[in-house]
Design a protein with these regions (language model features):
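Interface elements of modular peptide-recognition networks comprising either
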Residues: 1-105
Length: 105
């Protein structure tokens, strides 16, 4: 995937699922090769900067996209994913989330 490592100013954010209130936390992290993104706290799930698609939920080494901001017309900074509505796809299901930047202690 056309991914570029970026150092980001945001340290953490949450994806809050509309249908049931489930919250996923993502923290700034780097993978084994030093690529910087945001890793979900409960598994190897990433939100990363893609050179063409901008911020996506996806894999470093695969072209599959699992989620992205709903409003693609919004200007996106390379340093942190945009707050607002995100949508995801898992198999035949889709979910709507709010991405909220959070402060860390």
């Amino acid at each position: 995937m056309g991914v570029v490592a970026k150092d980001t100013g945001t340290i953490a954010f949450e994806l809050r699922r509309h249908i049931d209130g489930l919250v996923y936390r993502f923290d700034k992290a780097s993978d084994a090769t030093g690529r910087i993104g945001f890793k979900r706290s409960d598994g190897d799930y990433w939100i990363i900067w893609h050179e063409e698609l901008r911020w996506i939920a996806g894999s470093w080494d695969d072209e599959e996209v699992f989620g992205r901001p709903w409003d693609q017309s919004k200007r996106q900074s390379e340093t942190s994913p945009p707050e607002g509505i995100w949508v995801s796809r898992k198999g035949s299901k889709s979910y709507v989330y709010d991405l909220i930047h959070v402060e860390t202690p």
